[in-house]
Amino acid sequence: MESRKLISATDIQYSASLLNSLNEQRGHGLFCDVTVIVEDRKFRAHRNILSASSTYFHQLFSVAGQVVELSFIRAEIFAEILNYIYSSKVVRVRADLLDELIKSGQLLGVKFIAELGVPLSQVKSISGTEQDGTAETLPSSSSDKSLDMEKSKDEAQDNGATVMPIITESFSLSAEDNEMKKIIVTDSDDDDDDDVIFCSEILPAKEDLPSNNTATQVQPNPASVAISEVTPCASNNSPPVTNITPTQLPTPVNQATLSQTQGSEELLVSSASTHLTPNIILLNQAPLTAPPSASSSLPNHMSSSVNVLVQNQQTPNSAVLTGNKAEEEEEIIDDDDDIISSSPDSAVSNTSLVPQADNSKSTTLDGSLTQKMQIPVLPQEPPSNSLKISDVITRNTNDPGLRSKHVMEGQKIITLDTATEIEGLSTGCKVYANIGEDTYDIVIPVKDDPDGGEAKLDNELPKTSGSEPPNKRMKVKHDDHYELIVDGRVYYICIVCKRSYVCLTSLRRHFNIHSWEKKYQCRYCDKVFPLAEYRTKHEIHHTGERRYQCLTCGKSFINYQFMSSHIKSVHSQDPSGDSKLYRLHPCKSLQIRQYAYLSNKSSAMPVMKDDAVGYKVDAGKEPPVGTTSTPPQNKSTFWEDIFIQQENDSIFKQNVTDGSTEFEFIIPESY
């Protein structure tokens, strides 16, 4: 019996050529099956491409037709996102549009654009904004730069051939892949107004990094900065290192050499001093897929120190990159642990602490300031949606009884200065907004739940000592939201999409979009939807019922998008204006639960069991003349008694047949 050989081949250029072909088809309008209307522009695209690239379009096209309209995004920004979807590149975007582009990418669910703000927050010259009026801004010579975001996959040996400063960001992956993301900041001599950033994903060689990295002098254009990020290694049994590729450009201006210290990393950043406060808080938002019962602790003995050297000089100088490898062999980093989450939900940058101390500045060089910060290293435990707090300073108060009251109740109060830091908090925290002071007080529950499977720390101080440990674990009370209290009004914020609700039941119903605990299946096909109204909109396409009627010409349409396009194109009017230009008829083709009408008015609430709900209807009305009101009886009421479902008639009734003249109790089916 002869042996057979199996041969496999992979075309590495297929994905790029496929995207190029699809982009050409979109440019010529070939095979485009959907039209996206943004402001006054129409974009032709392919439904499958948009659904595969955006989670928003994936949900939208399951219920929408061939024409959709987006009102929460500008046409200029959507054009850039659409070009990225069909080319995997964000090309020549102005720096002042980056924030809006990233926000739109988060709304549309485009992962690469949504997470673009995390690495770009390290580059000061990209932000284009001033901090405290003393931050360095881009000079007029920055018009000779260009901005280009590229996402490609290269081999590991291509890493040494580049001649530009590199910012590397390490991600926790499996032991087989061990991939890393790298961001290359470069300057070009083209006659453009932008900066150029190349974002690529590489597969590094499995070898140990050198223990000593030489400090090199970089001469980029004025006000451009290169920053090395301190991140833990993705492989086990290795200490956290600073991934740096030293480079040198022509005509250096200044040379500086820093002493290398064992177990610490030093970054040099060219920026101005910002307004700082004495409180120090470390926030860590773990990925949402982590189980809430699992949490990670922060021992005091496992931490690495970072020295930040800020140079304040009159003439623009270049940043110096240097770093050292830590020598502690006993520190083990788990693959799923990050120092600070790089997800878009985290509002804390990876190389800064919020807020920082203003008084701990000391002069080291000519006009330079040094500040010491502590970045904790997480042990080998799964992450959780809990808040990591180190050296939390409680809010100052002259009343010792007030502080002891919060300690007895298991609460701790901290103060944040900016609203953006609230997104990094874990669930279970209550946020109080101080309108006059422009600050926020966060009440954090610190009680331990013995049933939560959380072990106490070894270095935890006894409760009789009067001081609480700085690294105490937090118990997550809510997995789906946190509460924001402004002027006494409670807002429930979804932990996934940050959408706010004033009613907790509405948030629970909305959260089914993310959790899919309930599934609503179409009665005509096999599609499943997270909300009942999504299913209703989809089933309209099966029945073909036209509920939206134009009041100008009387034509009816199957959905709002078609009707809106008709009014804009034919009648040249805006359907979203103050004037009512269309009518929405009730649904007659679908089986919607009958409305229930209560005619027996009671002056008191009936007795209920634990699993039943009762409503007091028209309690302020007087009974008709000649009728005697009967006292309430101790009779249990159930949902089946309130909602009367008729089997023979499944069509919505618009008139009351029991002699009543008005609606007394209405619950729509979709809500």
Swiss-Prot record:
Main location: nucleus
Effect of substituting residue 472 to A: Abrogates nuclear localization
Keywords recorded for this protein, A-Z: Activator, DNA-binding, Isopeptide bond, Metal-binding, Nucleus, Phosphoprotein, Repeat, Repressor, Transcription, Transcription regulation, Ubl conjugation, Wnt signaling pathway, Zinc, Zinc-finger
Keyword Iron-sulfur: no
UniProt region (Interaction with NCOR1), positions on chain: 1-103
Domain BTB, residue spans: 32-94
Name of the protein in its database record: Transcriptional regulator Kaiso
Source organism of this protein record: Mus musculus
